[in-house]
Amino acid sequence: MSPVAGAKFVRTPLQLYRYLLRCCRLLPSEAMQKHYQHAIRQSYNSHVDEDDPQRIQMIIQRAISDADWILNKYTKKK
């Protein structure tokens, strides 16, 4: 299950972008949040002209699973 509600409703690149930025708010330090926000913006800009629906869905699925992994890594209870 995704740490941020709404992952299953992500259908478009813009929805993915907003979802990933919301995920950044859960990271522990401000520097880490800024780093991942920048990476998300860069990735969005590099894929904004993608028009193949299958490729877009593949990118969305991969980005959500990567975000889940990162959040689980940095927000584990010790």
From Swiss-Prot:
It comes from the Eukaryota. CDD domains: Complex1_LYR_LYRM9. Pfam families: Complex1_LYR (PF05347). InterPro entries: Complex1_LYR_dom (IPR008011), Complex1_LYR_LYRM9 (IPR045291), Complex_I_LYR (IPR052151). Belongs to the complex I LYR family. LYRM9 subfamily. This is LYR motif-containing protein 9. The gene is lyrm9.
